[in-house]
Amino acid sequence: MLLKEVIDNSIDEFKMKSGDRIEIDVEDNLRVSVRDYGRGIPQGKLVEAVSMLNTGGKYDSKAFKKSVGLNGVGLKAVNALSAHFEVKSYREGKVRSITFEKGELKTDQTDKTKDETGTYVYFEPDNTLFKNYSFHDDIVETMLRNYTYLNAGLTIMYNGRRIKSRNGLEAVSYTHLRAHETEAI
């Protein structure tokens, strides 16, 4: 569920036509990074956007009527439930990086960058809250494949592997119909 909340923000960027690529890496089935190439979180609001309730950038915004995220609550929940949480916002030639440990701000730094705009989130769920957890590759890959079917043109890189659906659900429907057509004959 935590991973889904982070990815939903990236999907919202895609739906707003701000980035068509998302990169997800899972380390040792315990830690996750998600990088999108959308607009990036406004750097002046970055700490608030990931740690203070009722401060999400999508809250009350007509631009996000089709938002799949939790309107500003998702990243805050991931932060609160993580032993380590890091977010970077790339905008206007700068990257602002902040790090939290168990919800407490530890570092906040802004530097110049030539990297593309977007957002990077890295987190490790708190094992005192989630006993014996791990991210299961098959479940994560199925979830990501579903995202590409529901969002034609979206490219997701998962641990270096490309997951893409050119035609979204249209391709799934065609494949499904062809399979049943063969069975009927």
Language-model regions: role of each:
Residues 1-4:
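Conserved short strand/loop->alpha-helix "switch" segment adjacent to the catalytic nucleotide/phosphoryl-transfer site
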Residues 6-9, 74:
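Hydrophobic residues in the alpha-helical elements that line and stabilize the ATP-binding pocket
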Residues 8-59:
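Conserved beta-strand-loop-beta-strand hairpin that lines the nucleotide-binding pocket
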Residues 13, 84, 88, 182:
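Active-site catalytic microenvironments for nucleophilic, acid-base chemistry
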Residues 30-33, 37-40, 45, 58-170, ...:
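GHKL-type ATPase core
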Residues 175-182:
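Conserved small/polar residues in nucleotide/adenosyl-binding loops
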